[in-house]
C-alpha cells in the first residue's frame, strides 16, 4: 500500500483536509499540514476509525477480468456476475454508514416526492397522501462524484427474484390505465396541441372557427400521433439495451426455461419504461456490466389538472400562454376562444369582448386608439361618432362634445384651449362649426361672432377681417380708460367717440347683409391670416393690438399703408449652414473641440462627463474621444494630415541615386557582459590603453573610434557592459552594421550576453562572436559555442552562419583574424552611402566641457558634415565651430561612417538624437523653437491629461510614498542610465521619482530644489563646489556622489527600505493550560494555569484556544506566581493569568503566548 498525502486522501473521502486532520488527531496521529504523507499503517488506522472499507486493487482487477470473460456466457451467468460486481466494483474507499438507506431505483425520483413502498400501487387519486418512510440518504451520499451505491437490502434482491414473473403479468394489463401512460399521453397531447395551436394562431380572424371545426379531426390525429410518438420513445429508450436484447434473442433456442424468464422481464421493463428517465451508473472499469436504472417522472393526475405552460387538457383547464380550450377558458395572449373570452391584444371576439389596440367589435366595446364602433364607442383621435361617445384625444362627438383642434361638431360645442364659460363658448383654432359658432382665440362675446381661420360653413357665416357686416357692440368708455395707459388717454377717447358712431352703422348693415353667401368669406380670409402670421402671440394678446385692430380705423389704414413698405424692407435671411463634418488633429483641447462643433464648452464638458471623463476647458481629448462626442451631434470627423516643417526641410527620401553611392566603412559595435573584455579587446585593436581611465574598470559611456585594417577603415563603438546602460546599448545597435559579441571563454553566456544578442537581433545586424580569454587555463570555447546555440547563434563549423573567432585581448592573439572577419561581413553587406547628400547622423554621446562648452560625439551616417554647417539635433541648434577626429586631430569634413567630436551647439543634445545639417540658420532656429515649445506643451499635457485610468490610478496611489531624486552627471547617457536604474526600484509602496536630471556640476539651485521637494541629490562623476556643500549641509539635504553605478543603486535601495512600513512575523513563545478558575470582584476572571511548553512573558500577546478554535486574541493583563507579579514563567511552572477585556476563561482552555518581531527588508 502506497503512502498518501492528506489533501489527496481528503479528495477521495469527499471531505476537507482540515476535517481529516482532526480525525487523525483523534487517533493520536499528528501531521504538519495538508501536504504531509501518511504511512500505510496510519492509513489503515484512519480507515478503521472512520469506518471505511478499502478494497485490494489487484484483486479487483483480476475479478473484473474474470467478469468480462464470463459476460459472454448465458443470461443466468450474467446475472450472477452482476451481483458479484455490484458488491466489488468500486476501487474508491466507501464510507459505511449505520443509517438505513432505502433505495428503489425503479420508483426513485430525484426530488424524493414520489418514493413509494415496494410492490404497492400508487394511489394517485389521493390528494394528500403521505410516504410510509422517511428517506434519509440518497444513492450517491458520501461517494465521489460519478459513483452510485448499488448495494441494496437483501429483501430487495429476494423480491426481485420472486416477483419478476408477476411484474411482467401485472405490467401488461395495466398498460392502458396506469398513470404513467396517462402522463405520457398528456405529454404527447400537449405537444401536439401546442403545434396545432401555432397554426390556429396564424389564422388571425378565423381562429375560433378553425378550432371548432377541427375538433373532431384533431382527436383522431392526436390518437395517431400518440401511437407514433409511443413507438419512437420506446425505440429511443430501448437503445442502451438493444445489444443485450439482440444477443438474448439469438441464444433463445439454446437457453433453458429459466433463462427466458429474465428476458421477458427485460422486455416488459422496456415496454413499461415509457415516460421514465434512464440513469446509467458510471463504471469505467467494467463497461460491459453497466446498468440502466429507469426512473419515473412526477405523476400528473387526470382529475382537475392544473394547467401549465403549453399544457392543454380537456377538463376544466386553467388557460395559459398559447392555450386554446373549448370549455370555460381564461383568455390569454393571442388566445382565441368562443365562450366568454377575455379579450387581449389583437383579440377579435363576438361575445362581450373587452376591446384592445386595433380592436373592432360590435357589442358594447370600449373604444381605444383608432377604434371605430357603432354602439356606444369611445371616440379617438380624428374619430367621429354619433351616439354618446366618451371623448379622448382629438375626439369629435355630436352630443355635448368638447371642441378640440380641427374638431368639427354641430351641437353646443365647448371650447378647450383658453376656454371660458360653457354658456358663452369660444371657437378654437381652425375650428369650424355651423351652430352658434364663436370667434377664435382672443374671442369676445358670443352675440358678436368673429370669423375664424380657415372657417368655411354655409350656415350663419361669420364676418372676416374688415368685413362690414360685423356686429360690434358699443364700447364702454370707463373700461377703456382703466385698461389703457394714462399717456394715451386723450387719443383713445377720440377713437372711442368715432367708434360709437360707426357701431350704429355697422349694426344696421349687419342686419341687411346677414344672408350673404360663403364666397365672400373665402375671399376675405387671406388678410387675417397674414395679420396673425406677422404678429407674435404676446403682441396679438396685447390691448393695443385689440384696440388698433377692432376699434381704430385709422390704425387699420396706416397698417394697410405700411404693407407696401414692409414688402420692400423684408430682408432675405439665408438658412443656417448645417455642420456635417469637421477636420481635427490627433489631440485637441475641449475648447478647440467646442469651437469646431460650434457648441459651447459647457455642452462638450457635459457630454464628456456622461462618458465618465472629467475634463476642464484646457484638458486635451484624443481623436477617438472627439469622434464619439461629434457623433452625438451628428457630425463626422476627419483626422488632419499634419505636414511638419521638418518633413519639408529634411531630405529623408529613401530612394538614392545608385551612380552617386560610394562604399563606406562598416560601423561595428562591441557588446557583451560585464568584465568579459570588451574594452580590452577594443584597446588591443586600437593598440591604445583606454581602459585605465574607466572607473572601476567599467566603461561608463560610449566611445567611437576608427581603425585601419588592410588599408580599410573600420569604425568601432564601445557600449557599456552594465545592464543599466540598456538604452545606450540599444541606441548603439541601431546605428551599427556589425556587432562583435564578446563572450569570456571561462564564464560562458551571461545575462547581459543574452540581452546583447536580443538587441543585435532586433537591430538586424550581423553578429560576429569573439570568444575572449582563451589564454586562461579554465577556458572552454566549445562550451561557449554550445551555449550560444541555445539562443539561435550557431557556429559555421557546426552548420550555422555565425562567425566565431577565439581571441585573447590580453596577449593580442587572433586580433587580425577578427578584423578580417569584420571586413568579410562588411563586403557581404555591400555597405554604401551618398557623400553628396544632406548630412545626417546620430549623436553618440554629449557632455558639457568646462572649457569648450557643449561637446557632442556624432556619427555621420549619410552625406558629408563640414565645419560651418548649421545642425539641428532634437531641440538643440548650433553652428559647427570645430570638428575633432577620434585621434584628436582637427578636421574640416567628415564623410559617412566617420565619428567626430563637434563644438558649437547651444545646449547639450540628447544622446541618441538624430542630427541634420541645414543650410539656413533662420530656418534651423525656427524649427528648434517650435520643437522646444512642443516639448514644454507635452510636459504640461502629460500632467493635465485626464482619462478614467489615470483618475483611478491617482485614487489608488493615495498611500504611495515618493522618493524624489535629483541626478547630475558628467554626460547625458549617464543621467539616463542612473534614472532608469533607480526607477526600476519602484514598487507598490515606494515610487522613485526623478524630479530633475541634467549634465553638469551640482549647483546651489539644485540644493534649493532638493530642499523644497524633499529630494536626494545623486552626483555621478561630478563634484560640488565648497559653497554647494555648505548650502546642502545648512539645508539638511542628502547629497551623494558616486563614480560607479552599483553603489548608487545599493544606497537608494537602502533609503527605500527605510521608508517601507516594517513587516512583522509571529513568534510563538509557549502554551498555557487553564486548570482552575477564580472570579475576583473588581478584577474579573483569573485563570490558574500550567505552562505546558515554552515560556510566557508578561507583555506577550495571547490567543485563547478552546477545543481547537480561537475564541479571543488579546494581551495579558497580569502574570503572577503566587502573589508576586513576574516578568515571565517558564515551562513546568504554574501561574495565574488574566487577559485584558476578556473574562470568559474556562477550565481546559489553552492560551497560546506569542510576540510580533519586526522583519528586516
Swiss-Prot record:
GO terms for cellular component: cytosol. Residues 75-89, 147-157, 166-201, 228-238, 293-304, 485-515 have a biased composition (Basic and acidic residues). SUPFAM superfamilies: Initiation factor IF2/eIF5b, domain 3, P-loop containing nucleoside triphosphate hydrolases, Translation proteins. Residues 718-721 are annotated as: G3. It is found in: Cytoplasm. Residues 808-810 are annotated as: G5. InterPro entries: EF-G-like_DII, IF2_II, IF2_N, P-loop_NTPase, Small_GTP-bd, T_Tr_GTP-bd_dom, TF_IF2_bacterial-like, TIF_IF2. It comes from the Bacteria. Residues 697-701 are annotated as: G2. One of its GO terms (molecular function) is GTP binding. One of the essential components for the initiation of protein synthesis. Protects formylmethionyl-tRNA from spontaneous hydrolysis and promotes its binding to the 30S ribosomal subunits. Also involved in the hydrolysis of GTP during the formation of the 70S ribosomal complex. Belongs to the TRAFAC class translation factor GTPase superfamily. Classic translation factor GTPase family. IF-2 subfamily. This is Translation initiation factor IF-2. It comes from Ruminiclostridium cellulolyticum (strain ATCC 35319 / DSM 5812 / JCM 6584 / H10).
Amino acid at each position: 500500500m502506497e503512502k498518501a498525502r492528506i489533501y489527496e486522501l481528503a479528495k477521495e473521502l469527499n471531505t476537507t483536509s482540515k476535517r481529516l486532520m482532526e480525525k487523525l488527531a483523534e487517533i493520536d496521529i499528528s501531521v504538519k499540514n495538508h501536504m504531509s504523507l501518511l504511512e500505510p499503517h496510519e492509513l489503515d488506522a484512519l480507515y478503521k476509525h472512520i469506518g471505511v472499507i478499502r478494497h485490494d486493487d489487484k484483486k479487483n482487477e483480476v475479478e473484473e477480468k474474470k467478469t468480462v470473460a464470463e459476460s459472454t456466457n448465458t443470461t443466468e451467468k450474467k446475472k450472477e456476475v452482476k451481483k458479484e460486481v455490484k458488491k466489488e466494483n468500486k476501487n474508491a474507499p466507501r464510507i459505511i454508514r449505520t443509517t438505513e438507506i432505502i433505495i428503489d431505483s425503479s420508483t426513485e425520483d430525484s426530488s424524493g416526492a414520489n418514493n413509494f413502498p415496494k410492490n404497492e400501487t400508487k394511489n394517485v387519486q389521493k390528494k394528500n397522501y403521505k410516504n410510509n418512510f422517511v428517506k434519509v440518504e440518497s444513492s450517491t451520499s458520501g461517494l465521489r462524484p460519478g459513483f452510485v451505491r448499488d448495494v441494496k437490502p437483501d429483501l430487495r434482491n429476494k423480491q426481485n427474484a420472486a416477483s419478476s414473473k408477476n411484474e411482467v403479468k401485472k405490467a401488461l394489463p395495466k398498460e392502458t390505465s396506469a398513470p404513467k401512460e396517462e402522463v405520457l399521453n398528456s405529454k404527447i397531447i400537449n405537444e401536439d396541441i401546442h403545434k396545432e395551436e401555432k397554426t390556429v394562431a396564424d389564422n388571425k380572424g378565423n381562429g375560433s372557427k378553425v378550432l371548432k371545426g377541427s375538433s373532431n379531426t384533431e382527436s383522431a390525429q392526436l390518437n395517431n400521433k400518440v401511437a407514433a410518438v409511443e413507438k419512437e420513445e420506446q425505440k429511443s429508450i430501448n437503445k442502451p439495451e438493444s445489444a443485450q436484447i439482440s444477443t438474448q434473442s439469438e441464444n433463445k433456442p439454446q437457453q433453458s426455461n429459466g433463462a427466458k424468464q429474465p428476458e421477458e422481464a427485460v422486455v416488459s421493463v422496456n415496454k413499461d419504461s415509457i415516460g421514465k428517465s434512464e440513469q446509467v451508473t458510471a463504471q469505467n472499469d467494467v463497461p460491459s456490466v453497466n446498468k440502466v436504472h429507469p426512473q419515473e417522472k412526477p405523476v400528473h393526475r387526470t382529475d382537475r389538472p392544473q394547467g401549465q405552460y403549453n399544457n392543454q387538457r380537456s377538463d376544466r383547464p386553467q388557460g395559459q400562454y398559447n392555450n386554446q380550450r373549448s370549455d370555460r377558458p381564461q383568455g390569454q395572449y393571442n388566445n382565441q376562444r368562443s365562450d366568454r373570452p377575455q379579450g387581449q391584444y389583437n383579440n377579435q371576439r363576438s361575445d362581450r369582448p373587452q376591446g384592445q389596440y386595433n380592436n373592432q367589435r360590435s357589442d358594447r366595446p370600449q373604444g381605444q386608439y383608432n377604434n371605430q364602433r357603432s354602439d356606444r364607442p369611445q371616440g379617438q383621435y380624428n374619430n367621429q361618432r354619433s351616439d354618446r361617445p366618451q371623448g379622448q384625444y382629438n375626439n369629435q362627438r355630436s352630443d355635448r362634445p368638447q371642441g378640440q383642434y380641427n374638431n368639427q361638431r354641430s351641437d353646443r360645442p365647448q371650447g378647450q384651449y383658453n376656454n371660458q364659460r360653457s354658456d358663452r363658448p369660444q371657437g378654437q383654432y381652425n375650428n369650424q362649426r355651423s351652430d352658434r359658432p364663436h370667434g377664435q382665440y382672443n374671442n369676445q362675446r358670443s352675440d358678436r361672432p368673429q370669423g375664424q381661420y380657415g372657417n368655411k360653413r354655409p350656415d350663419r357665416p361669420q364676418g372676416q377681417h374688415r368685413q362690414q357686416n360685423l356686429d360690434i357692440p358699443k364700447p364702454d368708455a370707463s373700461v377703456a380708460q382703466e385698461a389703457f395707459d394714462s399717456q394715451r388717454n386723450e387719443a383713445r377717447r377720440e377713437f372711442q367717440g368715432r367708434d360709437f358712431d360707426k357701431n350704429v352703422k355697422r349694426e344696421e348693415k349687419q342686419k341687411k347683409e346677414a344672408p350673404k353667401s360663403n364666397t365672400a368669406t373665402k375671399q376675405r380670409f387671406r388678410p387675417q391670416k397674414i395679420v396673425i402670421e406677422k404678429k407674435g402671440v404676446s403682441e396679438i394678446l396685447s390691448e393695443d393690438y385689440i384696440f388698433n385692430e377692432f376699434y381704430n380705423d385709422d390704425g387699420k389704414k396706416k397698417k394697410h399703408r405700411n404693407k407696401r413698405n414692409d414688402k420692400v424692407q423684408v430682408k432675405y435671411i439665408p438658412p443656417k449652414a448645417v455642420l456635417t463634418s469637421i477636420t481635427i488633429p490627433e489631440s485637441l483641447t475641449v475648447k478647440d473641440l467646442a469651437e469646431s462643433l460650434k457648441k459651447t464648452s459647457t455642452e462638450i464638458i457635459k457630454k464628456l462627463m456622461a462618458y465618465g471623463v472629467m475634463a476642464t476647458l484646457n484638458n486635451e481629448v484624443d481623436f477617438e474621444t472627439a469622434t464619439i462626442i461629434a457623433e452625438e451631434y451628428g457630425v463626422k470627423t476627419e483626422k488632419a494630415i499634419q505636414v511638419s516643417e521638418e518633413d519639408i526641410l529634411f531630405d529623408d527620401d529613401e530612394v538614392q541615386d545608385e551612380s552617386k553611392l560610394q562604399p563606406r566603412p562598416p560601423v561595428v559595435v562591441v557588446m557583451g557582459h560585464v568584465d568579459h573584455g570588451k574594452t580590452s579587446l577594443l584597446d588591443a585593436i586600437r593598440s591604445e590603453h583606454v581602459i585605465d581611465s574607466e572607473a572601476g574598470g567599467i566603461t561608463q559611456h560610449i566611445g567611437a573610434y576608427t581603425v585601419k585594417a588592410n588599408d580599410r577603415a573600420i569604425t568601432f563603438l564601445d557600449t557599456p557592459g552594465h545592464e543599466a546602460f540598456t538604452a545606450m546599448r540599444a541606441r548603439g545597435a541601431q546605428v551599427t552594421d556589425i556587432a562583435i559579441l564578446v563572450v569570456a571563454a571561462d564564464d560562458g553566456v551571461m545575462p547581459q550576453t543574452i540581452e546583447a544578442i536580443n538587441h543585435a537581433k532586433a537591430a538586424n545586424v550581423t553578429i560576429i562572436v569573439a570568444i575572449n580569454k582563451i589564454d586562461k587555463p579554465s577556458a572552454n570555447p566549445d562550451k561557449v559555442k554550445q551555449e550560444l546555440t541555445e539562443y539561435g547563434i550557431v557556429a559555421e563549423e557546426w552548420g550555422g552562419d555565425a562567425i566565431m573567432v577565439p581571441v585573447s585581448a590580453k596577449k593580442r592573439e587572433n586580433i587580425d583574424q577578427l578584423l578580417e572577419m569584420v571586413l568579410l561581413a562588411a563586403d557581404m553587406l555591400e555597405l554604401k552611402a551618398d557623400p553628396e547628400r544632406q548630412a545626417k547622423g546620430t549623436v553618440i554621446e554629449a557632455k558639457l566641457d568646462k572649457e569648450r562648452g557643449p561637446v557632442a560625439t556624432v556619427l555621420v551616417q549619410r552625406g558629408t558634415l563640414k565645419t560651418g554647417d548649421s545642425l539641428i539635433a532634437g531641440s538643440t541648434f548650433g553652428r559647427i565651430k570645430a570638428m575633432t577626429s577620434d585621434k584628436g586631430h582637427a578636421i574640416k569634413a567628415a564623410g559617412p561612417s566617420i565619428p567626430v567630436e563637434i563644438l558649437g551647439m547651444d545646449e547639450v543634445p540628447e544622446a541618441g538624437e538624430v542630427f541634420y545639417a541645414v543650410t539656413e540658420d533662420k530656418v534651423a532656429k525656427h524649427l528648434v523653437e517650435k520643437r522646444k515649445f512642443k516639448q514644454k506643451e507635452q510636459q504640461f499635457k502629460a500632467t493635465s491629461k485626464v482619462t478614467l485610468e489615470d483618475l483611478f490610478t491617482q485614487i489608488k496611489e493615495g498611500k504611495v510614498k515618493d522618493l524624489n531624486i535629483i541626478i547630475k552627471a558628467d554626460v547625458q547617457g549617464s543621467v539616463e542610465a542612473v534614472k532608469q536604474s533607480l526607477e526600476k526600484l519602484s514598487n507598490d509602496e515606494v515610487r522613485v521619482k526623478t524630479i530633475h536630471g541634467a549634465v553638469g556640476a551640482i549647483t546651489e539651485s539644485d540644493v534649493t530644489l532638493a530642499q523644497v521637494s524633499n529630494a536626494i541629490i545623486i552626483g555621478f562623476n561630478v563634484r560640488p563646489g565648497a559653497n554647494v556643500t555648505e548650502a546642502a549641509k545648512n539645508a539638511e539635504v542628502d547629497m551623494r556622489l558616486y563614480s560607479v553605478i552599483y553603489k548608487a543603486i545599493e544606497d537608494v535601495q537602502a533609503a527605500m527600505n527605510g521608508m517601507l512600513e516594517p513587516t512583522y512575523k509571529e513568534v510563538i513563545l509557549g502554551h498555557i493550560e487553564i486548570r482552575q478558575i477564580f472570579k475576583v470582584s473588581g478584577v474579573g476572571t483569573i485563570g490558574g494555569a500550567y505552562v505546558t511548553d515554552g515560556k510566557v512573558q508578561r507583555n506577550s500577546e495571547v490567543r485563547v484556544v478552546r477545543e481547537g478554535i480561537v475564541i479571543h486574541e488579546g494581551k495579558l493583563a497580569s502574570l503572577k506566581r503566587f502573589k508576586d507579579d513576574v516578568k515571565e514563567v517558564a515551562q513546568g511552572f504554574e501561574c495565574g493569568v488574566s487577559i485584558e477585556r476578556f473574562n470568559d476563561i474556562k477550565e481546559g482552555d489553552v492560551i497560546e503566548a506569542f510576540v510580533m518581531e519586526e522583519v528586516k527588508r
